[in-house]
């Protein structure tokens, strides 16, 4: 199976497994990826997801060998994106565990995620530049929002490889981890997020996503509206702090 779902506690790991194709995504694989994240979204027990590419490569993009074979990626204005879940807006966070290359459509999958944990020898890039294949899974939208227009233009126009250290320094990668540790460290981070009060975490995440399309006044109102909705959870947390929990920067209740 090119896509499988694994669960540990509140953390769901979606595994992309086409190592013989460097985890390039064809049409059926894109559909399976989208379905996997729909299952995650609808699972009340699942709080955070990790997307990981098996075999040492995150994803080499769309499988160009599938074009014209009946297994090509679906390209239409409606429905799922060509790479699968890239048009979805989930209510829960997703972390990309990046080993090896996250390039072309694979970069766009990583950009769709909320956070990116990258191994020290990982490489990001718009490698589809050399083939004349456009970014149509959110790359021209999410990349400049994430790292700024100037840096995004550099990556998009040149198609150059961006090593993990540079990606981290520009804010494209959120964590750098040793080679071979991306999945484990992403799942560890996911477990930490899953331990937080979830209504508040999801409300703040939604406010961050919404503010990109709103003026400041509207964004502030939206933030307050969501905050009111989960304030009871915050009051419980304040009571625990007053009782001595979580002092000195600790996330533990003791």
What role is predicted for each listed range?
Residues 21, 31, 53-90, 102, ...:
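Glycine- (often His-adjacent) and acidic-residue-rich active-site loop
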Residues 29-32, 182, 223:
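Hydrophobic alpha-helical membrane-association signature
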Residues 1-54:
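Conserved CoA-thioester-binding segment of acyl-CoA-metabolizing enzymes
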Residues 14, 51, 63, 109-111, ...:
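Hydrophobic/aromatic residues within transmembrane alpha-helices
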Residues 88-199:
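Crotonase-fold acyl-CoA enzyme core
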Residues 37, 58, 124, 241, ...:
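Conserved hydrophobic/aromatic "anchor" residues
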Residues 43, 56, 73, 197-198, ...:
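Hydrophobic/basic alpha-helical segments enriched in Actinobacteria
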Residues 1-9, 159-164, 184, 188-191, ...:
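C-terminal alpha-helix plus adjacent terminal tail
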């Amino acid at each position: 199976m090119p896509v499988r779902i694994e669960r540990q506690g509140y953390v769901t790991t979606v595994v992309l497994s086409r190592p013989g194709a460097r985890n390039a995504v064809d049409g059926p694989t894109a559909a399976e990826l989208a379905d996997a994240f729909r299952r995650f979204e609808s699972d009340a027990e699942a709080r955070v997801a990790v997307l990981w590419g098996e075999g040492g490569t995150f994803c080499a993009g769309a499988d160009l060998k599938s074009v014209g074979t009946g297994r090509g990626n679906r390209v239409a204005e409606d429905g799922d994106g060509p790479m699968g879940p890239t048009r979805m807006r989930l209510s829960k966070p997703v972390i990309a565990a990046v080993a090896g290359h996250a390039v072309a459509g694979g970069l766009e999958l990583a950009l769709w995620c909320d956070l990116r944990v990258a191994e020290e020898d990982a490489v990001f890039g718009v490698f589809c530049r050399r083939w004349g294949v456009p970014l149509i899974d959110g790359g021209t939208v999410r990349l400049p929002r994430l790292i700024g227009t100037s840096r995004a233009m550099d990556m998009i126009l040149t198609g150059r490889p961006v090593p993990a250290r540079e990606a981290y320094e520009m804010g494209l990668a959120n964590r750098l981890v040793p080679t071979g540790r991306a999945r484990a460290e992403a799942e560890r981070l996911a477990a930490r997020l899953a331990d937080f009060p979830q209504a508040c975490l999801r409300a703040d995440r939604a406010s961050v996503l919404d503010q990109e399309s709103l003026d400041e006044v509207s964004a502030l109102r939206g933030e307050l509206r969501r905050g009111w909705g989960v304030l009871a959870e915050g009051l419980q947390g304040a009571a625990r702090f007053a009782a001595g929990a979580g002092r000195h920067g600790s996330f533990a209740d003791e």
